[in-house]
Amino acid sequence: MNTQKPFENHLKSVDDLKTTYEEYRAGFIAFALEKNKRSTPYIERARALKVAASVAKTPKDLLYLEDIQDALLYASGISDKAKKFLTEDDKKESINNLIENFLEPAGEEFIDELIFRYLLFQGDSLGGTMRNIAGALAQQKLTRAIISALDIANIPYKWLDSRDKKYTNWMDKPEDDYELETFAKGISWTINGKHRTLMYNITVPLVKKNVDICLFNCEPEIYTPQKVHQQPEKYLLLGELKGGIDPAGADEHWKTANTALTRIRNKFSEKGLSPKTIFIGAAIEHSMAEEIWDQLQSGSLTNSANLTKTEQVGSLCRWIINI
């Protein structure tokens, strides 16, 4: 009888969990490349604004260019979300403040000052987007690893597009699965006659919290109609996924994830259930690695992997598809 624990396929010691300097460096570079890629639309909008605003001879002339009024409002510090709460008079006042306090004092350089202020607030918007992007990239990496494991095992799968908000249109594996991971909300497969459906970012009623990864014992077609996420006995696995690569925030991310996983175990235990729990993280520092290792040894945490280590992620995904 095989008594080997699932994590022992890819973790031999606590040190295997830790993120190395080289892995941090690669993670930061990948994040910087993604940030550069995502900044392109912001820069192009600023260039378009400069062209449109260049017909103005004075800052006040900008008020008569109707097609740039939203951009002027943005440059004044009013976000798209905030402007919904403002009257037309409020908007005009904000734009006038921009002109009188910043553009007019800039003299002949008022166009450059406008573009600078526009980009300043666009940068805030990009920063907010990038804070969410680490989690999205982590999910994409995990998804690609799961479908690769399914492909290697020659197991057909279906996938759910996150843009389908009804969560009912499960599609067969496409011939060309390029960038499928970008939009996958869920993946489903059958192994040894057992139906498995994995979903991302689901609010689990039993714990009243959002959980990053949930694996269900059900066919994909019944997941939404039968509200499977409301049936505790259908949960096979729940997991936390932390894609942030900054070591300074690693311990805090683990504390948040650990609290969530403990709550999950407690709530399911109250129902006499014990689904598997996993933790996957990109930034794993020494102290948290020891805590994770202790939980793996005791069995409170079923499996874990460092997201920056391809072999670990691959091994974990191979285990997931065989549950």
UniProtKB/Swiss-Prot annotation:
Report the EC code(s) recorded for this entry: 3.1.21.4
| Gene expressing this chain | bsoBIR
- Catalysed reaction, written as an equation: Endonucleolytic cleavage of DNA to give specific double-stranded fragments with terminal 5'-phosphates
What does the entry list as the binding residues for Mg(2+)?
D212, E240, K242
Q: Where is this site: Interaction with DNA?
A: K81, R131
Q: What do we know about how this protein assembles, alone or with others? A: Homodimer.
Q: Which domain of life is it from?
A: Bacteria
Q: Please give the name of this protein.
A: Type II restriction enzyme BsoBI
The GO molecular function terms of this record are:
DNA binding; metal ion binding; type II site-specific deoxyribonuclease activity
Q: Which UniProt keywords apply?
A: DNA-binding, Endonuclease, Hydrolase, Magnesium, Metal-binding, Nuclease, Restriction system
Extract the InterPro entries matched here.
Restr_endonucII_AvaI/BsoBI_hel, Restrct_endonuc-II-like, Restrct_endonuc_II_AvaI/BsoBI
Q: Which organism is it from?
A: Geobacillus stearothermophilus
Q: Which GO terms describe its biological process?
A: DNA restriction-modification system
